[in-house]
């Protein structure tokens, strides 16, 4: 451009450049705008989805509280079950749905439908990548399996848990399952392991369980 001597030459050069590059420039800008607005639309959709899932989850929490009460009606139990299913069906890729499935499993346990409870817990385990969520679901699955009379498999299931923040809870649960299965010595060892690592506030209950074993002369 510096070699050009007149404005007309500069204008003509710009025209020629535009003819050669204008269409690709417009296309590039259009694509860039589409990406920007598409990203914003996606973010907005994600926000709305999270808000709706959160609202449904809060409704589920309230419904489960009512459905779990001793005086709960069949309608209240049905409402809670419907909300849990809707949360999973409509927002299955959210954490709210996984928490909802945990509630659903609890409702099935209350009804004595252990197979359905296991299905809900297995769904949580399949959907979640979070180690804490997986640990919670696995511990609940172990309880359900023990209630079905399969304590040995339940304990084996617990052996695979490695989440450090749940080590005390897992050891205590093992003690409960061993005790229910009549393996008193193993129950005592599990309780002692839990008590050794437990925070101060959790020790009284563990000590009570150990004292109970001692009182039985075991």
Description of each model-found segment:
Residues 1-31:
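N-terminal positive-inside, membrane-proximal cytosolic segments immediately preceding the first
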């Amino acid at each position: 451009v510096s070699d050009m001597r007149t404005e007309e030459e500069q204008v003509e050069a710009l025209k020629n450049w535009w003819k050669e590059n204008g269409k690709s420039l417009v296309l590039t800008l259009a694509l860039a705008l589409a990406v920007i607005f598409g990203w914003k639309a996606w973010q907005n959709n994600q926000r709305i989805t999270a808000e709706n899932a959160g609202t449904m989850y809060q409704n589920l929490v309230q419904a489960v509280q009512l459905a779990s009460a001793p005086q709960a009606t069949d309608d209240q139990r049905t409402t809670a079950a419907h909300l849990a299913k809707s949360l999973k069906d409509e927002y299955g890729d959210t954490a709210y749905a996984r928490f909802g499935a945990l509630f659903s499993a609890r409702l099935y346990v209350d009804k004595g439908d252990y197979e359905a409870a296991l299905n809900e817990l297995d769904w949580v385990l399949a959907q979640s990548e979070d180690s804490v969520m997986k640990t919670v679901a696995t511990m609940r699955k172990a309880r359900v399996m023990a209630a079905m009379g399969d304590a040995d498999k339940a304990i084996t299931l617990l052996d695979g848990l490695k989440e450090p923040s749940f080590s005390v809870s897992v050891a205590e649960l093992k003690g409960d399952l061993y005790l229910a299965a009549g393996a008193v010595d193993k129950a005592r060892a599990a309780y002692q392991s839990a008590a050794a690592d437990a925070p101060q506030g959790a020790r009284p209950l563990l000590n009570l369980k150990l004292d109970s074993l001692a009182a039985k002369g075991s």
